């Protein structure tokens, strides 16, 4: 009997996302319920954005939740390497096989040519897609341009008509017209694969039998199915999971909800409760109970109990569930967990240098630096009153800073300062006009330790969460303002 093997393949390009944890949990439970294996693979072919720091955060976040893997970059295994950046020769080999078999082709089109092509198609009211012009090149012309070292990509061929039937374990057969599919790039001009080629090759070579992934990948499933057909490989069973959503039913995003697992760890949520809550996202126990452990979820896991309606990720409900778990802890364990969460040596050593020089007694530490150990702050709107700025300008400055910080990939003091500086300069203000607002939002006080140091220590999610909290306290942002301010944001360097 074939061993069930599932996997999660996150990209290490930022903080570990709760959506990644959600998909990892369901893949883990499916594998373990069938006595199988769960694999962790790192999709790090985006060389500009991928970092080993983000990779380690993924490891730490999943382990904090209690999700362990049988094979992966840090534990090894017989199907490695488990980082896509280390599998370049493998992808090149299989891409060449597709070209030699006539299923893929070399494309030498420049970015300018592609942009012009799409502009002309849109002007004609057509859906932008590659028009196949490279297929008209003769073999001699292709070889000449390859020999000359001309930049190129490898694209797959796709049918121009007909229907692709996607067998989904949740929805049954889903029909998708081939004319919606573009001639997908498989190998980029830097020699690295795109998601589609790497995904198919890795899943096959690693013996993945079942793929549970987010439903946002369903529209592009025909490309993956066609690649399996081209290679002559059996495709894994496919299951497209419903996406997590904000309370307003929009797709879960960091603009409306904290999305990093590390945020919830820092906020003092229990990993058991977090995992329990993610397990309830579109799935339920046979007896409908709300509180259950990972072991209980594995024991009773059944895909047929997954609802296709977009599950709502609601922090208030998560907090309620966390309270159920927390209050059932023995007092000794409760005390130990509080100490580990708030007063662990690593976190204290980050804070101590910024507090020590500002206090005369230990009793002054809590009033000065207590905000380091809180989640949502009790804010006073009076703290945001400014002699220089109107109430609308206060909200505008804070919202633009929040948006600017959302684009920050490396969370460092100098870069945080640069974001704030860019916003105030674009508004023809001074840094001193914005900093009191930042003190108020981040620390809940008019003055404290360096707010820039505090933001670096608190991290991106908690910092952005507090800025959103302050903006909401001051009345939020209207649709009209949102539209106008986003245009302004686009002009900020």
From Swiss-Prot:
GO biological process, one term: glutamyl-tRNA aminoacylation
Pfam families, sorted: Anticodon_2, tRNA-synt_1c
Renumbered ranges of motif 'KMSKS' region: 251-255
InterPro entries in alphabetical order: aa-tRNA-synth_I_cd-bd, aa-tRNA-synth_I_codon-bd_sub2, aa-tRNA-synth_I_CS, aa_tRNA-synth_I_cd-bd_sf, Glu-tRNA-ligase_bac/mito, Glu/Gln-tRNA-synth, Glu/Gln-tRNA-synth_Ib_cat-dom, GluQ/Sye
GO cellular component, one term: cytosol
Subunit-structure text: Monomer.
HAMAP family: Glu_tRNA_synth_type1
Function field: Catalyzes the attachment of glutamate to tRNA(Glu) in a two-step reaction: glutamate is first activated by ATP to form Glu-AMP and then transferred to the acceptor end of tRNA(Glu).
Official protein name in the record: Glutamate--tRNA ligase
Species of origin: Pseudomonas entomophila (strain L48)
Gene: gltX
